[in-house]
């Protein structure tokens, strides 16, 4: 891809924690076909000792320590749901001092169209560009009062007090309610205005009361300095092709911020995610007998009357083509299918033995 007759080059940086050599190799193999215009590097945030390797380096020990310290201040719910990787968002200007501008995106995402244009959107005095959070609109609730009430309910559910305990602060958050899953970052402004320290100070003030920790801090501290990007750059699949949202054909990145396609196969967009995965070196470890069993169970649970073999057939040729897994058929070996059927037979025998004895 070119812009103004200049070829674009995608330098990919993966923030990881103690990633295995096998998975490093698989990620390198994944982008190998695109090596003419891309490369990949790894930045490990672990506090373990690491041997220096090609394109793999360890995070500065002081920053790693600060990230861990901040993470431990999160409430128990957030620590269970998120890894300490989320705290890296506060430190991008320090982590990538070689850049004045960069694109950041979460790992539970899938690019379905080119996103390079977002890099060239003028940010001017904005700290970053992001897509506005749309979950309230999706449930026909779209006011600061609605946001306040929903956050109070969520805070009560997880046993904490919300960091924004009044409507005035809820209004500020609502006016700057953006999703941090895709950010076009103006790191030059971050450094110039010492945004990193501002974010940390705010986080330390609110700490365990932040329901969405890093995202809450970014939205509140950077209020008025966030450029709204088109929804296509950070789209939740279930919202697409519905009123007030673009079509799935217009989307550039799908963000599975709720149910994950590798856990729940009925998630809208799961087919696209698996179609991408099956083209990578990770496919052999993923598409195995346990996968087929999980796939089978996900559909079997919908209809208890479906027989085993028909459940598998339904899963692989589901009538709704958004969920269909028929693309897997040419890649499923007879050996794998036999292993799966034997696995199901053994399950039945075990159940029968338990009933008899």
Located regions from the model:
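Histidine-anchored nucleotide/phosphate-binding helix
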Residues: 1-6
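Active-site-proximal specificity loops/subdomain of glycosyltransferases
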Residues: 33-92
């Amino acid at each position: 891809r070119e812009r103004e007759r200049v070829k674009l080059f995608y330098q990919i940086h993966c923030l990881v924690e103690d990633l295995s050599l096998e998975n490093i190799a698989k990620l390198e193999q994944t982008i190998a076909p695109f090596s003419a215009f891309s490369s990949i590097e790894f930045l490990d945030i672990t506090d373990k000792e690491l041997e220096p390797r090609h394109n793999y380096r360890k995070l500065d020990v002081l920053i790693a320590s600060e990230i861990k310290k901040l993470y431990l201040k999160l409430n128990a719910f957030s620590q269970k749901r998120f890894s300490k990787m989320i705290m890296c968002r506060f430190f991008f200007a320090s982590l990538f001092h070689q850049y004045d501008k960069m694109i950041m995106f979460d790992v539970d995402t899938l690019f379905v169209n080119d996103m390079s244009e977002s890099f060239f959107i003028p940010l001017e005095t904005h700290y970053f560009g992001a897509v506005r959070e749309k979950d309230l609109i999706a449930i026909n609730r779209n006011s600061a009062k609605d946001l306040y009430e929903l956050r109070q309910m969520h805070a009560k559910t997880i046993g904490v007090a919300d960091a924004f305990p009044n409507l005035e602060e809820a209004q500020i958050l609502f006016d700057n309610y953006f999703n941090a899953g895709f950010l076009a970052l103006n790191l030059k402004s971050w450094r110039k205005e010492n945004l990193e320290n501002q974010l940390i100070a705010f986080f330390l003030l609110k700490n365990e009361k932040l329901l969405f920790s890093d995202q809450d801090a970014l939205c509140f501290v950077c209020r008025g300095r966030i450029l709204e990007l088109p929804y296509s750059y950070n789209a939740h699949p279930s919202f697409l092709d519905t009123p007030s949202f673009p079509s799935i054909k217009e989307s550039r990145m799908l963000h599975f911020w709720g149910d994950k396609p590798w856990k729940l196969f009925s998630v809208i967009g799961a087919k696209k995610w698996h179609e991408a995965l099956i083209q990578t070196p990770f496919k052999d470890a993923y598409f195995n007998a346990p996968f087929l069993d999980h796939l089978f169970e996900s559909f079997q649970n919908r209809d208890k009357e479906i027989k085993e073999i028909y459940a598998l057939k339904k899963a692989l040729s589901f009538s709704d083509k958004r969920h269909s897994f028929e693309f897997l058929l040419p890649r499923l070996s007879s050996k794998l299918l036999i292993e799966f059927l034997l696995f199901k037979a053994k399950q039945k025998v075990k159940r029968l033995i338990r009933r008899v004895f």
